[in-house]
């Protein structure tokens, strides 16, 4: 599952109260004030954890609060500050205001952090208010409430593998074959104007994000065609698959294409040439010309007649249309990607996600999320106690609460099981009857989630 959006409520801890207290001292009115200040409330802090890959945790745990500061004490003892609540997010998380959509933070690198909600200031004890006119004040100050708001977390996609090559060499077809993405494919130059992304998942558990980079032409590094905008996308990947039309369907020489594209990469930024790259000789299913061109390419590469980086000398004959050779290519790329360090560079665009037998989630749809648009089949009627407090619908249902106490909904199996029970008991139907709207919160036992 790849969840890339979550809406959460954050609240800094309230400040502790200052107190009224007096010490015992001869000739001093009431012994003199000695009320300590309250402690500051804890902040809610977002911090990048490179080990995280999704916003899964915040689909179920949407109310996050800092600890309250302790109250002051006598003898001018100040209350202890409340503990900060540090929540971990994956690299590439963008923080936005829920109402305006204003970007508050862009968390990319390890240990990047952002204070999402400030803790409240501690209240002042009566000692703070003593003055020549009032040497024994009998009042103090309460702590200030912590900052509170709804924020949206959005995870920008990190593409590990980029598909490069001339227009119409089959990059979009390759992406759609191996990731179940659905790029728009037409036979004219610059078909792909923005990178399309998809997730490649292999049986043994290997997984990486692949991006179809907009097509190149000669002179791109000087601004021709799509110019620098596609070259910047290339910089963000771990490695590249250079797709060529080995059958020369459009009359171009695939060997010359490789040299031309290399010159464009080198002209833009020589460091791009240091990225691991392999050649995918596509359209091998289209006749003898493909076989002849492949042999010519292999001969030139092996004899060093064609000046290409060493990493380009790994050539995979494939057909994106028929699937020929794709497994060998993907196995090699998956192994290489696992060995390479993360770039922490991101694509701020939508992600096409694959379907699997266990999970058919899409970009903003978690397994546990109930959608208004889903058709509800007839289910056994079940009695729910549902009451509304603000925008929170509190559900009382003995069996569902019992299930939540017995399973861990943070595991995939737990979520599958609980979602099945939610459907079985017809909870969504009952909530719709009560007037629930997208964005409202549903609470069952101690578990809260957002209705979408």
From Swiss-Prot:
Obg domain mapped to chain residues: 1-158
InterPro entries: G_OBG, GTP-bd, GTP-bd_Obg/CgtA, GTP-bd_prot_GTP1/OBG_C_sf, GTP1-OBG_CS, GTP1_OBG_dom, GTP1_OBG_dom_sf, OBG_GTPase
Location (main, coarse): cytoplasm
Compartments where located: Cytoplasm
Gene Ontology biological process terms in this record: ribosome biogenesis
Region (Disordered) location: 66-87, 117-143
Keywords: Cytoplasm, GTP-binding, Hydrolase, Magnesium, Metal-binding, Nucleotide-binding
Binding-site residues, Mg(2+): 172, 192
Entry's EC annotation: 3.6.5.-
GO molecular function, one term: GTPase activity
Residues noted as binding GTP in the record, renumbered to the chain: 165-172, 190-194, 212-215, 282-285, 319-321
Cofactor: Mg(2+)
One GO cellular component, as annotated: cytoplasm
CDD domains, per database record: Obg (cd01898)
Domain annotation OCT: ranges: 376-452
Assembly, per entry: Monomer.
Record-stated family: Belongs to the TRAFAC class OBG-HflX-like GTPase superfamily. OBG GTPase family.
Designated name of the protein: GTPase Obg
Lineage: Bacteria, Bacillati, Bacillota, Clostridia, Natranaerobiales
């Amino acid at each position: 599952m790849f969840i890339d959006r979550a809406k959460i409520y954050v609240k800094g801890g309230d400040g502790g109260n200052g107190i009224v207290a007096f010490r015992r001292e001869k000739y001093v009115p009431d012994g003199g004030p000695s009320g300590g200040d309250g402690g500051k409330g804890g902040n809610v802090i977002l911090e990048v954890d490179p080990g995280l890959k999704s916003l899964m945790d915040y689909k179920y745990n949407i109310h996050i609060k800092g600890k309250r500061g302790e109250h002051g004490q006598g003898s001018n003892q100040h209350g202890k500050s409340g503990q900060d609540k540090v929540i971990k997010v994956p690299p590439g998380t963008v923080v936005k205001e829920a109402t305006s959509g204003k970007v508050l933070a862009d968390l990319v690198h390890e240990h990047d952090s952002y204070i999402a909600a400030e803790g409240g200031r501690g209240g002042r004890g009566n000692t703070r208010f003593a003055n020549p006119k009032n040497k024994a004040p009998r009042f103090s100050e309460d702590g200030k409430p912590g900052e509170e708001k709804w924020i949206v977390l959005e995870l920008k996609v990190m593409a590990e593998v980029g598909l490069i090559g001339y227009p119409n060499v089959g990059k979009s077809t390759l992406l759609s074959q191996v990731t179940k993405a659905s790029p728009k494919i037409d036979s004219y130059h610059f078909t792909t104007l923005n990178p399309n992304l998809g997730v490649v998942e292999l049986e043994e558990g290997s997984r990486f994000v692949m991006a179809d980079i907009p097509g190149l032409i000669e002179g791109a590094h000087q601004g021709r065609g799509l110019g620098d905008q596609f070259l910047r996308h290339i910089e963000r990947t771990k490695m590249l698959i250079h797709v060529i039309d080995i059958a020369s369907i459009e009359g171009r020489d695939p060997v010359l294409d490789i040299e031309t594209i290399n010159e464009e990469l080198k002209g833009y930024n020589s460091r791009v040439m240091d990225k691991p790259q392999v050649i995918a000789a596509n359209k091998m299913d289209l006749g003898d010309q493909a076989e002849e061109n492949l042999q010519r390419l292999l001969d030139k590469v092996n004899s060093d007649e064609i000046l290409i980086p060493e990493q380009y000398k790994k050539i995979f004959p494939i057909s994106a249309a028929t699937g020929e050779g794709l497994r060998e290519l993907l196995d090699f790329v998956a192994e290489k990607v696992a060995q390479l360090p993360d770039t922490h560079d991101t694509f701020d665009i939508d992600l096409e996600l694959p379907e699997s037998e266990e999970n058919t989630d899409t970009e903003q749809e978690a397994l546990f999320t109930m959608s208004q648009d889903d058709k509800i089949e007839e289910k056994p009627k079940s009695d729910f106690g549902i009451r509304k407090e603000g925008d929170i619908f509190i559900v009382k249902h003995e069996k569902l609460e019992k299930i939540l106490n017995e399973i861990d909904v943070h595991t995939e199996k737990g979520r599958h099981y609980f979602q099945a029970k939610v459907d079985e008991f017809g909870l969504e139907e009952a909530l719709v009857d009560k007037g629930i709207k997208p964005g409202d919160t549903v609470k069952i036992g101690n578990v809260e989630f957002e209705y979408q």
